[in-house]
Structures are given as C-alpha cells and as structure tokens.
C-alpha cells in the first residue's frame, strides 16, 4: 500500500457485508441534529485552510452538528490515516505519511481563530513512530500555550503499544490539563473489536500516567452495544477506579456503515443513567453517560469541576 493511501469500509475491516434488513432499528432516543449551519461551514473552512482534521468529521461523530454550532471541535493530529483497523471505527486505515512539522503551529492558529478556551486533541494510532507520536502531542500543547492564552488542553491518546516508556517521558515535555485514553469495550470483546490492543495494557497506561504525573486528571471512555453485558461494564468501571481513573464517559456504539461491526443492542437512557449513578458511587469525580455521549462531547463542562475553572 502506498503512503497516504486510505482504506475504508469493507477494504479496511474485511468484514462480510451485513444485510441492513436484519439490523436493529434505531430507537427514538438516538437523535442528533444535522450538521448544517453557517457556523459549521465557517469552522470547516478554518480547518481546511490550515490543513487540519477533526475526529468529528473523520469518525462520523453524531454530535458534529451540535459541537460545531457551539464553536468547539476535537482536533485529530498526525494525519487522517491510522495504522490500526478497528472494525467499529470509521477512520481510514493505511500507511501514514511523515509527521507535519508545521501542524503544531497550524493547530494553535486554528484554536486562536476559533476563539476556543478548551480543546481536545486526539490522533490516529501511529505504530510506525518510536514514541507513538507522544512528542508530537507535547509539541502541539506547547504551541497552543505559546500562541493562545488561558486555553485548557485535553489529550485523547492511543495505547502507545510497545512505546509506553518513551511516550510517558516525551509527554512530560509539555503536559496536558487532562489525560484521556479510552478502553472502548469489555475485555471479552477486545479480539474482535480492538485487534492489536490489549485491555490490561490500556489500563496500565492510565495507571502509569497517573503514577508519573499525579497532578493531572485521567479519563477514559466506553461504548455500549457491541455485545457486552451490564455486569461486564460495571466490572470495567471498577477496574478503571482501581487503576486511578478520575473521569468516565459512556455512550452508545453507532455503526458507521454496513461494513462495520453490527449494533447488538441499544441501551436505554434509563440504563445509561444507572451507569452514571454507579460510577459516582465508585468514586469517579465526573461521569457523562448517555446514548450520544462521546469521549470529547462537552469535555469542557465535564472537566470544569476537576480543573476548578
């Protein structure tokens, strides 16, 4: 495969196409506003002018319209081609291009132009880099803080598989305000839904970051509907607390296309609320739990209490 060439859909996941007639119907509570407004066009224009990507667009997030209308976005750095091919995700797979050394500056310029005060920076997984891209994260944070004033930065990182020591060291060059790494699902479903990832290694990443930088809040996210049970979710939540995770997001998995993993169930708003209450009882400082919640959805509001801003 050529550098920069993208694989999506069936080419990426290698899953058999599923008959849509057999798919579960979306319930009435799965509703997201269409991303059509002048503000969406304005923000998209800024991003394209600076050659930036948002996970909102690349992962077909159901909240894109609402978040763009509010003037917020989650930036995806290090390109838009991922070295992994998770069958729940709509980000393209392939051989990524070299890092763009001008990206940190462009990112800071975009944040200034968009007048943001809280930003989330995430990335594709870059198994091809010696530190998984951690130094690039730190460079982006440093550039934001040099060019803007008072902006809080949350990073949503991959698992840095095989590069954790180097990643933790390089992140220390310029630390975020919040460190986020998603477990995504329960350990029983990892082989199918997160090929290449390891449940306990992801837990350990959260724990090691907390041990290394104890003053930085940690966060993780789960998506429901891949075939997990309620008790399995509660067990993962307990594991996260044991490993020092402070904040949690829980949302509904929505299938990007018929070439991705099918939705096994739609969790009711009442059950999402039960998970939220259970999480607070376990000791999470903040739990956002609902059908359309994503790890970066209203991240500024969730972090407000923790960061005392």
From Swiss-Prot:
Keyword list, A-Z = 4Fe-4S, Cytoplasm, Iron, Iron-sulfur, Metal-binding, S-adenosyl-L-methionine, Transferase
In short, the EC number is: 2.8.1.8
Q: Which reaction is catalysed here?
A: [[Fe-S] cluster scaffold protein carrying a second [4Fe-4S](2+) cluster] + N(6)-octanoyl-L-lysyl-[protein] + 2 oxidized [2Fe-2S]-[ferredoxin] + 2 S-adenosyl-L-methionine + 4 H(+) = [[Fe-S] cluster scaffold protein] + N(6)-[(R)-dihydrolipoyl]-L-lysyl-[protein] + 4 Fe(3+) + 2 hydrogen sulfide + 2 5'-deoxyadenosine + 2 L-methionine + 2 reduced [2Fe-2S]-[ferredoxin]
- Which compartments is it annotated to reside in? Cytoplasm
Give the residues the record marks as binding [4Fe-4S] cluster 1: 56, 61, 67, 296
Q: Name one GO molecular function term.
A: 4 iron, 4 sulfur cluster binding
Against InterPro entries, the record matches this protein to: Aldolase_TIM (IPR013785), Elp3/MiaA/NifB-like_rSAM (IPR006638), LIAS_N (IPR031691), Lipoyl_synth (IPR003698), rSAM (IPR007197)
Cofactor requirement? [4Fe-4S] cluster
Q: Which NCBIfam families match?
A: lipA, PRK05481.1, PRK12928.1
Its pathway is: Protein modification; protein lipoylation via endogenous pathway; protein N(6)-(lipoyl)lysine from octanoyl-[acyl-carrier-protein]: step 2/2
Co-factor remark: Binds 2 [4Fe-4S] clusters per subunit. One cluster is coordinated with 3 cysteines and an exchangeable S-adenosyl-L-methionine.
Tell me what this protein is called.
Answer: Lipoyl synthase
The broad enzyme category this protein falls into is: transferase
Q: Which PANTHER family match?
A: LIPOYL SYNTHASE, LIPOYL SYNTHASE, MITOCHONDRIAL
Instruction: Indicate the family of this protein.
Output: Belongs to the radical SAM superfamily. Lipoyl synthase family.
Q: Gene3D superfamilies this protein is in?
A: Aldolase class I (3.20.20.70)
Q: Does the keyword Transit peptide apply?
A: no
Superkingdom per UniProt: Bacteria
Naming one, the record's GO cellular component terms include:
cytoplasm
The UniProt record lists the Radical SAM core domain at: 68-285
Q: Which residues bind [4Fe-4S] cluster 2?
A: 82, 86, 89
């Amino acid at each position: 495969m050529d550098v920069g060439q993208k694989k999506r859909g069936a080419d990426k996941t290698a899953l058999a196409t599923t008959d849509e007639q057999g798919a579960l119907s979306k319930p009435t509570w799965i509703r997201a506003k269409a991303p059509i407004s002048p503000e969406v066009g304005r923000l998209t224009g800024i991003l394209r002018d600076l050659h930036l990507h948002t996970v909102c667009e690349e992962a077909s997030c159901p909240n894109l319209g609402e978040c763009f209308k509010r003037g917020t976005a989650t930036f995806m750095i290090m390109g838009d081609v991922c070295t992994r091919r998770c069958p729940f995700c709509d980000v393209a797979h392939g051989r990524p291009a070299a890092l763009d050394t001008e990206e940190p500056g462009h990112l800071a310029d975009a944040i200034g132009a968009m007048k943001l005060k809280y930003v989330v920076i995430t990335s594709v997984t870059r198994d091809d880099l010696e530190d998984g891209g951690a130094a690039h994260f730190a460079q982006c944070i440093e550039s934001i803080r040099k060019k803007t004033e008072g902006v809080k930065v949350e990073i949503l990182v991959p698992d840095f598989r095989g590069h954790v020591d180097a990643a933790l060291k390089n992140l220390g060059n310029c630390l975020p305000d919040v460190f986020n790494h998603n477990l995504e699902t329960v350990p029983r479903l990892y082989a199918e839904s997160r090929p290449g990832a390891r449940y306990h290694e992801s837990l350990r990443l959260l724990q090691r970051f907390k041990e290394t930088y104890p003053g930085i809040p940690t966060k993780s996210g789960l998506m429901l509907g891949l075939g997990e049970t309620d008790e399995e979710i509660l067990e993962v939540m307990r594991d996260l607390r044991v490993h020092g995770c402070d904040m949690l997001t829980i949302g509904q998995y929505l299938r990007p296309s018929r070439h991705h993993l099918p939705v096994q169930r739609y969790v009711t708003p009442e059950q999402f609320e039960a998970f939220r209450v259970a999480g607070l009882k376990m000791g999470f400082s903040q739990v956002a739990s609902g059908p359309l919640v994503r790890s970066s959805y209203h991240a500024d509001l969730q972090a407000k209490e923790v960061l005392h801003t």
